[in-house]
A protein has these predicted regions:
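Bilayer-spanning, highly hydrophobic alpha-helical transmembrane segments
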Residues: 101-144
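Membrane-cytosol interface motif
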Residues: 1-7
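Residue-level signal for pocket-adjacent positions within structured domains
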Residues: 1, 60, 66, 135-138
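Glycine- and small-hydrophobic-enriched helix-loop-helix hairpins
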Residues: 7-113
Length: 144
């Protein structure tokens, strides 16, 4: 579950940062270099570096990303459509929006799963403290 969460956060961060840079007028290769350095994930940094090399060699951005297998196919297809229609930044923002909502939903699920676990753990700790307090008293009463 945590791996899935980290992957979705990385995709959201990548698409949002790249979209913002493109909207600001930064050329694609330079934007990819900046995004690579801010990825915060070595696997995604490598994929972004490979994608930049592919773009430099005349490929579309979506092709090397799809080959890597690290990005979901929906992401690479939407990026491909954005490149073909000239609306790459819009598609990137839509991907970011989708993955932000996915991350929120996953965090809510994790929170709902962790609450009972924390309650049981706290019950065990309190029980242990109570037993630790009463054991000496019980042993003293058996001596008398």
């Amino acid at each position: 579950i945590f791996g899935l969460l980290l992957r979705k956060v990385a995709v959201s961060r990548f698409t949002g940062t790249l979209a913002t840079l493109i909207r600001s007028g930064v050329p694609l290769l330079q934007a990819l270099k900046i995004v690579e350095s801010t990825a915060g994930n070595e696997v995604f940094s490598r994929v972004i570096r490979d994608a930049a090399d592919g773009v430099r060699n005349g490929e579309s951005l979506a092709e090397p990303m799809a080959r890597s297998g690290e990005f979901p196919s929906m992401v690479t297809r939407m990026i491909g459509v954005g490149e073909k229609t000239g609306a790459l930044e819009i598609m990137l923002f839509k991907i970011q929006e989708f993955y932000d909502s996915e991350v929120r939903a996953l965090v809510d699920q994790l929170t709902a799963l962790l609450e009972p676990v924390v309650m049981v753990f706290m019950g065990v700790v309190v029980g242990f403290i109570i037993v630790a307090l009463f054991m000496p008293i019980m042993s003293l009463s058996s001596i008398v």
